[in-house]
Every structure is written in structure tokens, then in C-alpha cells.
């Protein structure tokens, strides 16, 4: 009987072929990498950027932890003499925090690390710049996930360099607007149902007006009433004139308009109480009053005083704003207060109003006191980040709330764009005669 013979080299060719194919694919990806990154950055990141970054993290983790003082000796009580321990054994390797799976994200990657005994999340926060340098990424952000565990998020590029405006597909969810891009690459969303009142500050050419343009452009297609208070003669908010149900252009008009808004809010309270519901969202849709978004530009103009009469007006305006902030969320009245400068020197009413505005946005400001007033009571880290914004970073801001803080940049909506959007949706402007009468 003759046995069939096989060539042992035939099976050995398969590993070689696999290596050749892998080499060809890798070479091709490296060649087309620059073009792929420009045209399809997400695909480039998953195919090339993420694998290289994950390998870099795994390779440098132990040395990085030791260099940043995050390694702990296994036997600290031993005396080391001339690099030897005990009977000539080399010193034991120090313990380093363990990290989990390096998970890719749209803007980079993230991983969790378990702290060693005696370590704090702040120790990792201080090491974030070194991590970014060693891993060759744009930035690293460290947050506490739960006791003993931190989340380390890395960004391979700056998503705020050129944020892309979303494609408009209709009005979207009521009172929810995508106004820009966050540092994480996610959309920057202002949701007035979740955080009803906002304080937005920023110096000239900081991006404050652009953010307001983006917010109004997103609210204009929705079935809401927009009310403006612009005590600089209406120079800013008059762009949205066709879409505004009312616009006050000086402090006397503002006081009357705010008083009418308080009365409107109290009337809605009576309606809700009669219907046995806690807010307007509990009313039937046909009975529900239209939500009102009040935009106040340059809040300092309401509070600056030069005489007794102006002091009374400023006090009345401040009191009305505080009442709207306290009562408005449940009754469909929302505040967006903006200004170049906000400080306690404007009067106690400003501090009391600030406490009622849960959402804060701080662009580049001209004085540290404004940043302190905006963010200081929420998060000291957010305050430091806001003070680091440079004039070249127009549109970049730090946004903070009770949930934490993030950096973001608003989409570019020009004055021409804002005016066009307001005109296109002028037919959605609800008539509120009680507010119009206050301006006469």
C-alpha cells in the first residue's frame, strides 16, 4: 500500500501569507492615512489612531505611573543598600494602579483605573498633562467615577477647533437646542426643560453673542414665545424682532415688561392650581399655555444706578427677575441672562439672581470677578478653566451646572443668519397682548 506524502512546506506557507497580507494592509493604511484623516476622521481614528494609542498606553503605563508618583512600593519597610535588598535580591517592583480595557470613543479613548490605598482622584488629575504628553493626544480629562475608581478620557484632537453645525431637520424636541460642540466631541445641548434658567457671560468678541444667536436660531422654529430685554436700545436683540413677542429697549420698559411677566406667571399658577396639577406640563395640550423664553442682554444695564429714581427701577427689575426665576420653571417661563460683566458690586440683587440660575456659561471675561461670580460657587476647576481661555479662542466657553462642568464651543451663527431665521419663522410668533400692552 502506498501512503500519500505531503509537503510540510505547504502548510507553512499560510502563516507567511497572513503576514504578507497584514503587511500590505498596514502599509496601505499608512499611505492613505493622511487623506483618510482629513476626509473621514472617525474611520481614521478607529483603523489607525486608536490601535496606536492603545498600544502606547499599555507600553508606557507602568513607567508613567512611577514618574508621576502614583506607584507604591510593595515592601516600604525594607532598607535598600546599594540597590540590594536582604540577601542580594533585587528590590521588588512597585505597585501601580490597575487600569481596565482601553475603550475607543468618537473623540478619543477612555479607561478606568483603580486607585491604590492612600491615593486620591486629585493625584490623577495632576498627572493628566503628563498622560497627554506621553500618549501623544490633545488632552486628558480625569474624573471620579466612584469611590476608589477614576475615569481617564483622552482626546486625540481638539473638537473645538472647528465645530460643525448640525443639519437642521425640523424644530426638534421642545425647548431643547443644540448650540455647539463639547470638548468630548458630543453635542452641546441647552435643554430648558432640564435646566430652566441660564447665566451667560463673556467679554466683547468672546462668543457670547454667537451663543445667543445659536440659541435663538434653535428656538425660533419651535412653538415658544421669545421675549427680549435689551437696555442698550435694542441693538443686539432687535435682530430677532419678527420672532419676538415683546422687546424692551430701556430700563423703564424692562421694569414694566418684567412686571407683566410676573403677572402672567401668577395667572398660570392659578390655572394649574384650579386644574389640580403641579406645572403646566400636567395640563391638557389644548389648555397648556405657550412656553415663554425671556432673553436679557447686558444685565448690568438693569442694575447700574446714578440716582434715587434709577435705584428704585433697578430694585424693581431685580425683584421681578428673581421671582420669575423662582416660579417660572414649573409655569413655562424660562430665563437666559447674559452680560459682559456680572459682579456683586452691581448690588445684592445680582447675587440673589445668580443663585437661581442653575446653568452657567463663561466665555473669556475681562475681569476675574465675573468668572468668580459665574462659576465660583459651582466648581473651582471650572473657574480655572474659564480663566485660561485666550482671545484667540473666540466662542470657547466653560459651561457648568449641578451635574459638573465641560468646555464647549458654540456653532457660528452670524447676525445675518439669525435675522434670516427670525424672519422665516415670524409666523410662529404668539401674540401676548398683556406683554405688548406693558411696552406702550
Label for each model-derived stretch:
Residues 129-130, 141-144, 150, 156-169, ...:
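Conserved ATP-driven motor cores of ASCE-family P-loop NTPases powering translocation/secretion/packaging/pilus
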Residues 1-12, 70, 80, 84-90, ...:
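Actinobacteria-biased recognition of intrinsically disordered, low-complexity terminal regions
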Residues 146-154, 276-289, 340-342:
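Glycine/charge-rich, flexible interdomain linkers and switch-proximal surface loops
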Residues 1-49, 167-275, 289-372, 380-383:
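P-loop NTPase catalytic phosphate-binding loop
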Residues 144-147, 198, 204, 210-216, ...:
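A short, charged
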Residues 119-121, 160-162, 198, 302, ...:
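Residue-level signal for secondary-structure boundary sites
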Residues 45-171, 175-178, 185-186, 344:
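N-terminal "pre-motor" subdomain/linker immediately upstream of P-loop NTPase catalytic cores
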